[in-house]
Amino acid sequence: MGTLTVQTLQAPTSGANANKLLVGSGHTLHAAGHVIQTVSGAPATDVAYSTLTETNVFTLNITPKFNTSKILILVNYGLYLNSSAAYDRGDFIIRRDTTLIRGRDDGGGTGYFRDGSGHFKAYMTSFNHLDSPATTSQITYKMAWKGHTYTAGGSFDENYTNMSLMEIAQ
């Protein structure tokens, strides 16, 4: 292997690929900070919950191309409460395979989410998490809900609940 040192790369200014620098078939461009790949999805139907145990809301797979990549996880939870009870408390959880990377495993405390109104309500909760999985094997990311202390039950609406995963080069 040799090293090619240049000051400027310039694409042709005319033709079918005018002003484009092309990477040959079967090769990849690796530039820190760029998005290598994106996958996204949503549950096919509404997902109901009614207990204090962890409820799987949605899973999505990605296979990183580089073990140095970071995965930016973007999630939206469209939560509807079936509540006429005094409280509904819980936590929004993200797992990488079986490892908890966001949220809480225990059932104590008030949780991330708390509603004490005793009314039926809809909430839209969005957040992101930057993960460093250090692998090129397939990863399964899981969105979940875990009730804490009280749970009156509810559902995650398929039209407002989704997840996107972006592999970011380092």
Which ranges hold each PLM region?
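Glycine-rich, low-complexity segments
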Residues: 3-47, 170
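Terminal beta-strand-rich extracellular "head" domains
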Residues: 41-50, 63-170
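Short, solvent-exposed loop/turn segments enriched in Ser/Thr/Gly
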Residues: 54-56
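Extended, low-complexity regulatory regions
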Residues: 58-62
